[in-house]
Structure formats: structure tokens, C-alpha cells
């Protein structure tokens, strides 16, 4: 969202009240009329089926993940247009900027990361700051810059040599070093897949190659520590549920995609992703994953995992975060073997770390109310501005607005140039 250094006293509160009132009315209307949750433009049978699903719920239980009965995969917040949904958040940020005298204070929430991790930072820069004795908690990765003055073949040869030295073997996950929302993320299972990926990757930019961790469980753990506090805490734990279908032993994969209310909404995307296998009949009870991405835009959904936060998990994440220089706010995206192991602070691998731009994933739980969603978001940004103000007082200088917008423009332009996600 566009950002400004100026806030008009009193205006944010009045506008916030107006927007909140409108959203509250929409929430009450949707609560009274369950059928209205279906996306506009769908046929009547589909609308009725989705309404029944919302009322009844269906249980999701993937390997390693806690079981969860869901009524829909889309939260009320997720149904709002982004411009409308984030307007109250922007107004809240303007109020915080007025109070703390600086709109770009989040850019110094993590002083050793470019822009505090708010825009345009290197993904690898986070992982590199985790000390060597804690690297066992990190998925092995390397960063490679595709030289603009080298041929595709020479870039591929150099990257393969780097992979060999790092001990990384296929399958691997390829992703841009600068990016967001899963753009450009693909599974590369063979050297041929890697060659095709690099052919479509912009030269002069950096790519990350990471060992593929074949665990179904994935979570986003948002961590917060004030600069003057000796210990941090887990602000949010949200589970990612990847788009998938469960075989019944009779239906083809294509039919399962078309009839499952959780996948039919993005059936065209899912069918394209598994095109060679659409006619296959998965055995009864077999889970077929439809995307590598744990992103809402790929059909994934998130649900609240706050009840699974334990002192042991908090201590482990705090140990890692405190060893990262001047790291105060960010989300650890992890794959885990089982929820029991995660609760013990064991059996997980860090795939990515996100900085100041990270959101609490549990706010996108389909059962989350708009009131609670905004409460969490407002609290999150309050902490972010407080941390930024404290670090500014310690001598760290926030980025200028023009420089921030330049980073925003660069990242947005890169997203359009990356290979298609897988």
C-alpha cells in the first residue's frame, strides 16, 4: 500500500469508525444468510453445496497437522477487496506515524535487514544471520546470482557446481531471493527442471535453491521482542493447509478437484498443475497435493494454531531469534514433522524468515471474526512502530519515503518477471 509521512489529527479515528461500521454490517448480513458466503457468479447447485459445507463443516487432517473441522476455506477478511480491507490498517498506521513521528519506522524494526524486512530484502540474508551452531534448524540453502554477462549454459554449469559443493541434491525448491506471496517458487526435481527454471529467470537477479523438506506440516510463527527486553514471545502461530484432495478409490483426480468445495473455486489452476494425472484414480484415503505453495492465491488456507504454542516452542524460537543480530520482529515459516514435535520445540526446519512486512497468519482462519482480525493487526502494527521508535532512539535511521517507494516498485516489477509458480 502507498505510504505517506503525513497524518491529519482526528481524521483516522473518524474514518476508522465509518469503515468499521460498514464492515460490521456486512458481517452481520453474512452471518444471518449463510448462502451469501458463496462467491458471486457461481451456479445455484454450487452455492447451495458451499452453504451446506459452511453450516456442517468438513474435517481436514493432514499428516503431521492437527485435525480441524472447517466450514469454508475463505475467511470473511479474505472476501473483502484488499483496498477496502487494508484501509483501516492504513489509517491506523497513519495514527501511529503521527504519534511516533515517522511513517517508515518499521524499516528499523530489524536494523541489520534491508528496510527492516518491510520491502525488497534478501530472503537469504535472514538465514545467513542464524549462527552456525543453530543452522541445523534451517533448511540447507544457497543463493546464486545469474550473471547478466554469462550465457544460460554457463550460469547453469556454475550453479550446479555450487550445488555440488553445498551438498544439495534434487529435488530442490527454487525461489527468488527477493519476492513475496510465493511468486516464482517451484519444485525442481531434475537438472532439466532447473535448466527450464533458469531460462525463465531474469538475469542479474539472485535465485535461492533450498532442500525440499517432504513434511506436510507447515506453520508461520510470528515472533516479537522489544529492544529493551531480554526475551521475546510468539505473537502468533498459524497453520498452512495446502490445496489437496482425498481419493475415494472411484473418482479421477480431475473429478475430485471439480467436486471438492475446497478446490473447485480454483479448479482451473489446480487442473493445470496436475494436467498429466487428471485421469488417474487415487486410492481411497490417499491425499493428493495440488500445489507446492502455501499461499491463499494458490488455493491454500490458514487456520489458528495459538493453542499449540508452548513454553518449549517459545524458548526454541526465542533462542534462534535472539542469536540473529538486532532481530526483533518477524515470522519464521517452518515445515514440521508432527505437531507433537513442534510443541516440544523439535522436528522443524525453517524455510524462510519474513521481517517487518510479516502478518500473523492466524488472522486468515476461516472462522476468525473481522473484529478479532483487526484487533490482531492493529496490535501487530502498534508493536512494530514501538520497536521502530525504540531503535531510532538507539541511533538507527529509518529509510526515507522515496527510498521505500523505490524498493516497493523494484519488488513489484520483479514479481512480474519471475517464472510461473508451481
Model feature map: region roles:
Residues 98-101, 137, 205, 244, ...:
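Short secondary-structure junctions and interdomain/linker hinges
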Residues 143-144, 334, 355:
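Hydrophobic/anchoring residues in structured secondary elements
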Amino acid at each position: 500500500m502507498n505510504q505517506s509521512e503525513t497524518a491529519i489529527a482526528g481524521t483516522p479515528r473518524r474514518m476508522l469508525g465509518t469503515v468499521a461500521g460498514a464492515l460490521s454490517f456486512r458481517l452481520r448480513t453474512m452471518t444471518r444468510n449463510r448462502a451469501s458466503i458463496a462467491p458471486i457468479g457461481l451456479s445455484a447447485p454450487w452455492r447451495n453445496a458451499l452453504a451446506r459445507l459452511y453450516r456442517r463443516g468438513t474435517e481436514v487432517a493432514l499428516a503431521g497437522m492437527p485435525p480441524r473441522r472447517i466450514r469454508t476455506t475463505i475467511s470473511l477478511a479474505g472476501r473483502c477487496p484488499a483496498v477496502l480491507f487494508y484501509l483501516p490498517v492504513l489509517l491506523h498506521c497513519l495514527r501511529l506515524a503521527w504519534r511516533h513521528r515517522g511513517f517508515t519506522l518499521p524499516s528499523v524494526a530489524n536494523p541489520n535487514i534491508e528496510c527492516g524486512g518491510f520491502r525488497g530484502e534478501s530472503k537469504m540474508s535472514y538465514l545467513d544471520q542464524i549462527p552456525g551452531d543453530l543452522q541445523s534448524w534451517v533448511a540447507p540453502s544457497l543463493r546464486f546470482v545469474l550473471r547478466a554477462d554469462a550465457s544460460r549454459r554457463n550460469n547453469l554449469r556454475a550453479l550446479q557446481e555450487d550445488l555440488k559443493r553445498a551438498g544439495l541434491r534434487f529435488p530442490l525448491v527454487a525461489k527468488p531471493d527477493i519476492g513475496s506471496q510465493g511468486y516464482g517458487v517451484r519444485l525442481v526435481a531434475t537438472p532439466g527442471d532447473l535448466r527450464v527454471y533458469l531460462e525463465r529467470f531474469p538475469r542479474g537477479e539472485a535465485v535461492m535453491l533450498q532442500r525440499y523438506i517432504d513434511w506436510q506440516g507447515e506453520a508461520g510463527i510470528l515472533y516479537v521482542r522489544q529492544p529493551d527486553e531480554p526475551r521475546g514471545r510468539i505473537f502468533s502461530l498459524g497453520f498452512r493447509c495446502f490445496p489437496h484432495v482425498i481419493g475415494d478409490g472411484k473418482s479421477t483426480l480431475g473429478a475430485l478437484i471439480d467436486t471438492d468445495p475446497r478446490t473447485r473455486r480454483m479448479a482451473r489452476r489446480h487442473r493445470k498443475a496436475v494436467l498429466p494425472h487428471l485421469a488417474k484414480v487415487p486410492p481411497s484415503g490417499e491425499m493428493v497435493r495440488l500445489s507446492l505453495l502455501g499461499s491463499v492465491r494458490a488455493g491454500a488456507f490458514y487456520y489458528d494454531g495459538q493453542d499449540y504454542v508452548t513454553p518449549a516452542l517459545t524458548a526454541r524460537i526465542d533462542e534462534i531469534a535472539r542469536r540473529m543480530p538486532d532481530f526483533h520482529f518477524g515470522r519464521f515459516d517452518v515445515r514440521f514433522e508432527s505437531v507433537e514435535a513442534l510443541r516440544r520445540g523439535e522436528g522443524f526446519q525453517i524455510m524462510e524468515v519474513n521481517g517487518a512486512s510479516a502478518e500473523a497468519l492466524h488472522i486468515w482462519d476461516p472462522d476468525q471474526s473481522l473484529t478479532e482480525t483487526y484487533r490482531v493487526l492493529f496490535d501487530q502494527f502498534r508493536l512494530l512502530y514501538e520497536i521502530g521508535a525504540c531503535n531510532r532512539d538507539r541511533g538507527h535511521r529509518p529509510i526515507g519515503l522515496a527510498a521505500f517507494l523505490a524498493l516497493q516498485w523494484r519488488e513489484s516489477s520483479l514479481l512480474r518477471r519471475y517464472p510461473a509458480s508451481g
